[in-house]
Amino acid sequence: MESLVLVREEHPEIHHNLTELRRLSFEKMLDKFGYDTNLSHRLIEKFLHFRHEVTLYPDVEGCLRFLQGKYKIASLTNGNANVMRLEIGKYFDVHLSSEEVGVKKPDRMMFHQVSRSLEIPHQRILHVGDNPVDDVQGAVDAGLQAIWINRSQNPWPLDSTDPHEIRDLSELIEFLS
């Protein structure tokens, strides 16, 4: 983790590309311990393979089934997991990562790219996310509607008005019904 922080500081121009930041972090660690730095490419391949072995919350697939056909669904991430590589990828119309867009949430450009990709005005998009700054405030600042999914029941940490909050995705279904 420490090397990832150092790489971010050394390469601010790729702050949005978590995969390359992580690869460079692996490279830095390999070099530090006297290993061939070219191994960083194989390490990132392995990392990304295991990155996509996820366990979903029990409410995820049921919610996606409910939404499918009623709404266009997009995945928007600052990370390097691609929802289209998962079994639930079939429910999504669009997947966008900060690596593809060139900026990361909370930058408005991320949210506006979703609007363009879905061909829906950004004012008509509801963004559901778990990060108060990157997801909720970022979406609101970009002109989208936002819901905070707060599974841990934390207090709202920002000075801005509390957003609509849900504890799990069954509450999203209730909200939309």
Describe the role of every protein-language-model region.
Residues M1-P58:
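N-terminal helical cap/lid subdomain that shapes the substrate entry/recognition surface
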Residues Y35-T37, E61, R65, Y71-S177:
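Asp-based, Mg2+/Mn2+-dependent phosphohydrolase catalytic module
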